[in-house]
């Protein structure tokens, strides 16, 4: 666990340059807390309660070199803090990707880890680690899924109720094509031999995501790639309904994509593709609900260079998904960063907010509620650089806990003085440090300290109307409540009744 003192000083210095916002508008607590991942270079992570104690745990794939530490498991101990990593070896060289699901139906989360396999064929480029039933894991079982696994996902692609594994192989052993491998699950933690689908580009595919893109109830696939002209694309593989993906369709993404995720960012009920690029921008391709996508729209992230990961989550409590992007991939001290792009509400995004993560490179980011306060937090696989004594060079996990936004309430009257029995409307307007105030939050109104009623927010304001004020001078107060996403605030106005 993190120590204090010098660490805090070093982090604070880094964040003064990395974060162009006041402490009043912070979405996440600074500085982040940094843990060692148990390996040489944390590359990918997932969050799940692997020991079923009700507290989220972090699982880290620890890099692509021999002796890298395989996969590390950091048990959560409450409050968004974690124990030291327990590590488990994988079957070949290193671990570049990890996914978590119950693979054998025993109710306990298991692990699938993708590795840089090697040049022999077949190679155990996938390692399956079954949970022992206490959050620790059995020895890895190997499966061949290609040469260089960069991304893995778990989904029931053939509709038999058993989880299957999808793995993205960046390059075959001849370095000619990227491919996606599908391993159908048997329901007992074992899998059939991989069925592979060659992609349309060369050896440029880096990331995959899965979701039902056309509403048929079957998971489809989206992958980042580049075509033969070097244009950034996403490739869409629609499920035939039985777990086969024979057709590949490409869409220009406007960027060479390093990471892709799927989610409904514009609120139309259809999955959209969000692509982080190698050039510092993020592309949004709106889904049409039939497996096709609209033209990409690009947004700057404020991160110069190769972005590494993108995740989505509602960070400000307005009911719309926001974006978190990690990067850039540059080997400089305390270079790791994440960019937060708040959704405007219709799938467009505000200017980025930048947070430093304290390490050399931020390789992967996940959004999860780590301390069970109902507000999303961030976990970043962040290679350490040796500048922090409690995190020497090697793999690190940076934790940024979410904090409620400061709010400001103003209160106005429809007219003062008023006559006895006359209708008077009091309007409380609430502004948050980041993002809009959601509709439906109940604001309480008081007259000289006595509660007189409530009104729900609508478009950032709550209006309360009364005719019951007695003759005299009244101090009316509107109180906006605290919540996981917002701090409380209040305001008063004087009302004279003749």
What positions do the PLM features span?
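A short loop-to-beta-strand structural motif that recurs across blades of beta-propeller domains
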Residues: 69-73, 124-129, 178-183, 232-237, ...
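Solvent-exposed beta-strand/loop surfaces, strongest in extracytoplasmic domains of secreted
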Residues: 403-498
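Hydrophobic beta-strand segments that make up the repeating blades of beta-propeller
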Residues: 58-62, 111-115, 165-169, 221-225, ...
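Glycine-aliphatic tripeptides that mark coil-to-beta-strand junctions in extracellular
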Residues: 54-56, 107-109, 161-163, 217-219, ...
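Short glycine/acidic-enriched loop and turn motifs that connect beta-strands
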Residues: 63-68, 116-121, 170-175, 226-231, ...
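Blade-level signature of beta-propeller repeat domains, shared across WD40, Kelch, NHL, RCC1
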Residues: 363-404
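Blade-edge motifs of beta-propeller repeat domains
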Residues: 24-40, 75-93, 130-147, 184-202, ...
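Beta-propeller blade termini
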Residues: 43-52, 96-103, 130, 141, ...
């Amino acid at each position: 666990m993190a120590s204090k003192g010098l660490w805090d000083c070093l982090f604070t210095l880094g964040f003064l340059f990395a974060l162009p916002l006041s402490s009043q508008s912070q979405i996440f607590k600074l500085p982040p807390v940094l843990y060692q991942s148990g390996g040489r270079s944390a590359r990918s992570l997932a969050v799940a309660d692997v020991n079923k104690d009700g507290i989220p745990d972090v699982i880290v794939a620890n890099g692509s070199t021999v002796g890298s530490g395989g996969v590390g498991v950091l048990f959560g101990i409450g409050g968004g803090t974690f124990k030291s990593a327990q590590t488990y070896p994988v079957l070949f060289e290193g671990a570049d990707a990890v996914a978590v699901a119950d693979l054998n139906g025993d109710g306990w989360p298991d692990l699938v880890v993708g590795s840089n396999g090697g040049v022999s064929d077949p190679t155990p480029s996938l390692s399956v680690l079954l949970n022992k039933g206490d959050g620790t894991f059995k020895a890895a079982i190997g499966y061949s899924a290609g040469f260089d696994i960069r991304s893995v996902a778990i989904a029931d692609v053939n509709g038999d109720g058993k989880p299957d594994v999808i793995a993205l192989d960046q390059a075959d052993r001849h370095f000619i094509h990227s491919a996606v491998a599908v391993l159908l699950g048997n329901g007992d933690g074992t899998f059939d031999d991989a069925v592979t689908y060659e992609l349309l580009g060369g050896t440029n595919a880096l990331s995959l995501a899965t979701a039902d893109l056309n509403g048929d109830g079957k998971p489809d696939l989206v992958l980042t790639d580049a075509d033969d002209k070097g244009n950034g694309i996403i490739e869409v593989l629609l499920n035939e309904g039985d777990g086969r993906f024979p057709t590949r369709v490409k869409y220009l993404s406007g960027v060479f994509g390093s990471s892709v995720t799927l989610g409904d960012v514009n609120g139309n009920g259809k999955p959209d593709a969000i692509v982080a690029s190698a050039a510092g921008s993020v592309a949004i391709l709106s889904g049409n609900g039939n497996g096709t996508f609209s033209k990409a729209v690009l947004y700057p992230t404020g991160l110069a260079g190769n972005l590494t990961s993108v995740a989505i989550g509602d960070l400000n409590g307005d009911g719309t998904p926001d974006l978190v992007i990690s990067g850039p991939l540059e080997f400089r001290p305390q270079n790791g960063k994440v960019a937060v792009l708040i959704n405007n509400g219709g799938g467009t995004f505000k200017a980025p907010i930048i947070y430093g993560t304290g390490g050399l490179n931020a390789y992967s980011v996940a959004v999860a509620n780590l301390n069970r306060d109902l507000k999303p937090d961030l976990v970043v696989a962040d290679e350490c650089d040796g500048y922090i004594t409690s995190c020497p060079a090697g793999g690190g996990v940076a934790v940024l806990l979410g904090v409620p936004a400061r709010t400001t309430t103003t209160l106005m009257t429809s007219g003062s003085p008023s006559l006895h029995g006359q209708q008077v409307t009091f309007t409380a307007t609430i502004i948050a440090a980041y993002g809009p105030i959601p509709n439906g939050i109940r604001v309480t109104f008081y007259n000289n300290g006595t509660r007189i009623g409530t009104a729900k927010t609508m478009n950032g304001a709550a209006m309360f109307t009364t005719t019951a004020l007695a003759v005299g001078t009244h101090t009316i107060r509107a109180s906006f409540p605290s919540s996981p996403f917002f701090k409380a605030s209040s305001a008063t106005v004087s009302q004279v009744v003749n």
